[in-house]
Amino acid sequence: MSARPYNGAISLALTLLMPLSNIFGGATFVALSLRMSRLIFIKQISIALLGLSLIGLVINISIDELLISALMTWLPALLLVILIKKTRSLIFSVQLLAVFSVLFLLLFFWLIEQPVLFWNEVLMNVSDVLNQGGLVEQARLLTESITNIAQQMTIVVIAMTWSIYSVILILGCAIYRKSINDENIFGNFTDLNFGRFLAIMTAISSLFLFIFDVDWLNNLAYLCFSFFWLQGLSFLHWLHQKRIIPSMGLILTYVMLPFFNILLIMLLAIVGYTDAWFNYRNRIKN
């Protein structure tokens, strides 16, 4: 990455054409931005954009779509770079992203009086787009389930957004550390801990659900709990680092993630949540 700066431009372009391009493209952007000088990085972005335009011409993909994809991937990644440079701590940055997510959730419910109706309208628009694109069956299935989906949309969108950008930052910092052979800069993902404050906040908001049946409180409880899946994953990485679990165990976790998404994330969240209370790492060390 450092010896051949043009390799960075190639990486930026190619990762936007891969599956999960927002994650791999964003992580590559974070790593290169941290590694390169500002001038070299701007050159890499320019070359990558030129390369994407040429690729679009060759394989008959809309250049506008490729450039919009680049903007939608790189702009949030740039904000993550600014955040990590300010905090100088990966753990604190991920915690701040969680705080921003909670604040956004509260702001959303303050601004939108009836979130379910809001998401109903959004999903109906999506259904219309699917119909226009010839995906009639998918549009029909969406329309039939629209009420149930709309009730879950707020928590799903916010939790997924936080998860995606946290993973982008973690992966980008990991690539950067490898490129400079410094495993300690910005701290280690294996040390991620949201602490007892968030654990208590999750418990209190969950208990209040038995007294107050309000949507924002329900979403807040689920959102706070969902943060802990990443702490559960970091604990697995710590166990692997300490050679308590084999590499195959960690690999299987990632392999199963797309197939048992909700179940596995819930299990990881339970591990992470209990870790916040009992600090498994210290107990195992002792």
Kindly give the residue locations of the regions a language model identified.
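Transmembrane helix interruption/hinge and helix-loop junction motifs
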Residues: 16-24, 36-38, 59-64, 211-214, ...
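Small-residue-rich helix-loop
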Residues: 178-232
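Alpha-helical membrane segments and adjacent membrane-interface helices in multi-pass membrane proteins
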Residues: 22-81, 271-275
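Transmembrane alpha-helical segments in integral membrane proteins
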Residues: 156-180
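Hydrophobic transmembrane alpha-helices
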Residues: 1-43, 246-254
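Short helix-perturbing small/polar motifs within transmembrane alpha-helices
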Residues: 56-59, 67-111
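Membrane-interface interhelical loops and short interface/amphipathic helices
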Residues: 106-153
